[in-house]
Amino acid sequence: MEAGAYLNAIIFVLVATIIAVISRGLTRTEPCTIRITGESITVHACHIDSETIKALANLKPLSLERLSFQ
């Protein structure tokens, strides 16, 4: 194997490893939890769309905690 081809192979492996590490770090998130009690609904670390918001509002809780948009 030529020196240039060998160097290209090493660079390819390094770049692939870096991409794998970065993508694994980006996908590591907290689990989505929705806790519903008689008095409140707590939403944590969830991607919420308009249909989910309407469904939660239809439950008519006394309070809706930790609701955030991402």
From Swiss-Prot:
Cytoplasmic membrane side: 28-70
InterPro entries referenced in this protein's UniProt entry, alphabetically: TGBp3 (IPR003411)
Disulfide bonds: none
Topology Lumenal: residue spans: 1-4
Transmembrane segments: 5-27
One of the protein's GO biological processes: transport of virus in host, cell to cell
Keywords: Host endoplasmic reticulum, Host membrane, Membrane, Transmembrane, Transmembrane helix, Transport, Viral movement protein
Protein location: Host endoplasmic reticulum membrane
GO CC field: host cell endoplasmic reticulum membrane; membrane
Record's function text: Plays a role in viral cell-to-cell propagation, by facilitating genome transport to neighboring plant cells through plasmosdesmata. May induce the formation of granular vesicles derived from the Endoplasmic reticulum, which align on actin filaments.
Family per record: Belongs to the Tymovirales TGBp3 protein family.
Other remarks on this protein: TGBp1, TGBp2 and TGBp3 seem to act together for cell-to-cell propagation. TGBp1 is the main movement protein that physically cross the plasmodesma with the viral genome. TGBp2 and TGBp3 would facilitate TGBp1 function.
Protein name according to UniProt: Movement protein TGBp3
Species per Swiss-Prot/TrEMBL record: Potato virus X (strain CP) (PVX)
